[in-house]
């Protein structure tokens, strides 16, 4: 039986490491309909967040129904009303670009909504589930904040004034909602979720 010398072991490790690096550093080929300009990326990203907002109009009522804390229920109601406004603003943005509002499945939002559903399934109704709902809702908020911030930056560079105005208004509301959820969690919910 052959024993591997330190030099042979190092060669084997180096070869395996080289293969891993090659795979992780591989270039991803662009699809046929890939964005070629910032305007294309902007429009594609608008379709993505449009889908996300429309999906939220269906998911938020489920969160509301499963929440037990009155302040959390109120925060979800407010966010649902704002989400309908966000959909309208996105439709205005598409119209200002001369495009029909079109949704493209947002895998990130789908993942966040699936995770939120999972949290509700894995927690008993009450304070613990409410704390989980807040965590799931804030992950959604953070995704939306990142997306609207990026889209506003694109709109500014592209000189799309109507879109910029609408995107900044929505971005501001998403930040306020995130702070409201933090306040609800900090004031009552997280401490109620501790079993005494």
Where are these regions (language model features)?
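Amphipathic alpha-helical hairpins
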Residues: 2-196
């Amino acid at each position: 039986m052959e024993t591997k010398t330190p030099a042979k072991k190092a060669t084997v490790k180096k070869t395996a490491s080289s293969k891993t690096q090659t795979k992780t550093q591989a270039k991803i080929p662009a699809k046929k309909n890939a964005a070629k300009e910032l305007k294309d990326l902007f429009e594609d990203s608008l379709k993505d967040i449009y889908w996300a907002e429309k999906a939220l109009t269906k998911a938020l009522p489920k969160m509301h129904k499963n929440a037990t804390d009155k302040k959390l229920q109120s925060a979800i109601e407010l966010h649902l009303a704002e989400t309908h406004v966000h959909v309208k603003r996105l439709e205005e943005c598409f119209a200002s670009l001369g495009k029909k509002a079109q949704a493209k499945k947002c895998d990130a939002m789908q993942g966040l909504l699936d995770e939120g559903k999972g949290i509700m399934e894995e927690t008993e109704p009450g304070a613990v589930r409410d704390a989980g709902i807040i965590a799931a809702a804030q992950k959604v908020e953070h995704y939306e904040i990142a997306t609207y911030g990026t889209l506003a930056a694109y709109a500014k560079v592209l000189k799309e004034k109507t879109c910029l105005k609408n995107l900044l208004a929505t971005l501001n509301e998403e930040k306020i909602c995130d702070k409201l959820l933090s306040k609800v969690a900090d004031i009552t919910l997280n401490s109620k979720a501790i079993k005494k």
